[in-house]
UniProtKB/Swiss-Prot annotation:
This is Large ribosomal subunit protein bL27. It comes from Prochlorococcus marinus (strain SARG / CCMP1375 / SS120). The gene is rpmA. PROSITE patterns: RIBOSOMAL_L27. Keywords: Ribonucleoprotein, Ribosomal protein. SUPFAM superfamilies: Ribosomal L27 protein-like. It comes from the Bacteria.
């Protein structure tokens, strides 16, 4: 048996806390103004009508309403856009 730990065991053993990213309000849901719709890193989903974008790319509702997702084609890339329609 080895009398010393392998070097791998001292280099491993760390993990970062989860950032809880993702969709917080899905299509068809009612939301209030200021509600967070999506937490994301980068703009994988673009803001549409009545949706604001925070400095960390978080998308939030500007008005009370219903969440809509749509797919848009932009320069050979399919992108998603989220908007809030007045209800």
């Amino acid at each position: 048996m080895a009398h010393k730990k392998g070097t791998g065991s001292t280099r491993n053993g760390r993990d970062s806390n989860s950032k809880r990213l993702g969709v917080k309000a899905y299509g068809g849901e009612k939301v209030t103004a200021g509600s967070i719709l999506i937490r994301q890193r980068g703009t994988s989903v673009l803001p549409g009508a009545n949706v604001g974008q925070g400095k960390d790319d978080t998308l939030f509702a500007l008005v009370d309403g219903i969440v809509n997702f749509e797919t848009i084609k932009r320069s050979l890339k399919k992108r998603k856009r989220i908007s809030v329609s007045l209800a």
